[in-house]
Swiss-Prot record:
Residues 10-44 have a biased composition (Low complexity). The gene is MCA1. Coiled coil: none annotated. One of its GO terms (biological process) is apoptotic process. It comes from Candida albicans (strain SC5314 / ATCC MYA-2876) (Yeast). Residues 1-129 are annotated as: Disordered. This is Metacaspase-1. Residues 61-70 have a biased composition (Pro residues).
Length: 448
């Protein structure tokens, strides 16, 4: 992939989700015992073979929204990822400079975003238990005073025609930022496809095992940080055993491990089960996703707008566009296009009820007592750019997050979202998203 192009959805069949879940259970119970880093250099063999064959997770009948105009669609690689460890070469140059609290990115040629929000004083999250709703559902903010652990995943897909240039740099840059903000190298695990240690390559199994390490023995007020930079996509949402759907747009979001062709993608339902449902009340998870279609990739049901209010599914904009199309067709005498536009409007109104039901079901099933926050690079129907900033390849979302937090670490949830949007709006159409496992006060201080 070349700078400025989206990290697009791959085509082709994907693995059966029930088989993926089974594979997760097997990997999860292998047990890591000691810190992941202590086993890091012992080598970790790849799974003996791929999971059972293809199944119910086929490609959607209609493709998810494509890339912005002028950007190419990326096909799946023609062959499996390189199997020889020698082919995983390190980048030719070092990542950009250190990210301290008051430092800016790069070599001094970067733009200074002097009009950033976030200069005010923000209250830290309350330490007592919170509740909401008629059933008084309990949750708790984390004060992030406990252990700090981080899992950073960057996949360039080296040697394939789907190759990206920024993810490995993103991981190195986020690591530098975390080290400057209270995290220890002993509690940071990196999976990148330039590694020579087999266990550190971002295969599907290695990613799932590393997630297990991240959440293992989590306690209230711990601070966990998860960063993924790579390809993302969508697949058709499947109902649960009761026939209920939890995606208001009809699609689940996925991320693509290095070995996705043989072992499949990782679906948002599984990410939520492993990283959100397993955490105790008051444990913090900050997840940063720099990938396409990543708006709800962690299935957190409370998504916030740049006004600090909850977003609800709204397909009425599509209906308005359809009516405009029909009116223009009527004016030009194009009867067939007019009827087509009106048909789309009817379908949109029918979908609104389905979307609202899925959104409500997601809140019922995916609300969690832990303190999970997701910062994602774009909406579910958007692509996320692999770009170049100050002469260095980077993911646009990773760059925006690090730029905001490095120039002014005093941010609220809302100001962080607004500032990231402002940085990206100058060059990209993608819109960063903020979502949470429980309702949040977006004017509280963002801590991690």
């Amino acid at each position: 992939m070349f700078p400025g192009q989206g990290r697009h959805t791959y085509g082709g069949q994907q693995s059966n989700y029930s088989n993926q879940q089974q594979g997760y259970d097997q990997g999860y119970n292998q047990g890591y015992g000691q810190a992941y880093g202590q086993e890091y250099n012992q080598g970790y063999d790849r799974p003996s073979g791929p999971p059972p064959g293809q199944g119910q997770y086929n490609r959607p009948s209609g493709p998810p929204p494509g890339p912005p105009p002028g950007q190419g669609q990326y096909n799946r690689p023609s062959g499996p990822p390189p199997s020889q460890q020698g082919q995983y070469n390190r980048p030719s140059g070092p990542p950009p400079g250190q990210y301290g609290n008051n430092q800016t990115r790069g070599s001094g040629n970067e733009q200074n975003y002097g009009n950033m929000h976030g200069s005010g004083h923000y209250s830290r999250p309350p330490t007592d238990s919170q509740s909401f709703g008629v059933e008084n559902y309990n949750y708790q903010y984390s004060n992030c005073s406990g252990r700090k652990k981080a899992l950073l995943i960057g996949i360039n897909y080296i040697g394939t025609k789907n190759e990206l240039r920024g993810p490995i740099n993103d991981v190195n840059n986020v690591e530098q930022f975390l080290l400057a903000n209270g995290y220890s190298s002993d509690n940071i695990v990196k999976l990148t496809d330039d590694q020579r240690v087999q266990r550190a390559i971002p295969t599907r199994q290695n990613i799932l095992d590393a997630i297990q390490w991240l959440v293992k023995d989590a306690r209230p007020n711990d601070a966990l940080f998860f960063h993924y930079s790579g390809h993302g996509g969508q697949t058709e949402d499947q109902p649960d055993e009761y026939g209920n759907y939890d995606e208001d747009d009809g699609y689940d979001e996925v991320i693509y491990p290095l070995d996705f062709e043989t072992n499949g993608f990782i679906i948002d339902d599984l990410l939520h089960t492993m990283m959100v449902k397993t955490l105790p009340q008051g444990c913090r998870l900050t997840a940063l996703f720099d990938s396409c279609h990543s708006g709800s990739v962690l299935d957190l049901p409370y998504m916030y707008s740049t006004k600090g209010v909850l977003k609800e599914p709204n397909v009425m904009k599509e209906a308005g566009a359809g009516l405009l199309q029909s009116a223009m067709a009527y004016a030009t005498g194009d009867r067939s296009r007019m009827l087509s536009g009106l048909g789309g409007v009817v379908k949109t109104f029918m979908n609104q009820g389905k979307a609202e039901k899925a959104n409500e079901y997601s809140k019922q099933t995916n609300t969690a007592p832990c303190d999970a926050i997701s910062l994602s690079g774009c909406k579910d129907d958007q692509t996320s750019a692999d770009s170049k900033e100050n002469g260095t390849a980077t993911g646009a979302m990773s760059y925006a997050f690090l730029t905001v937090m490095s120039q002014n670490p005093n941010q609220s949830y809302l100001s962080l979202l607004q500032n990231m949007r402002e940085i990206l709006s100058a060059k990209y159409s993608q819109k960063p998203q903020l979502s949470a496992s429980h309702p949040i006060d977006t004017n509280l201080q963002f801590i991690f």
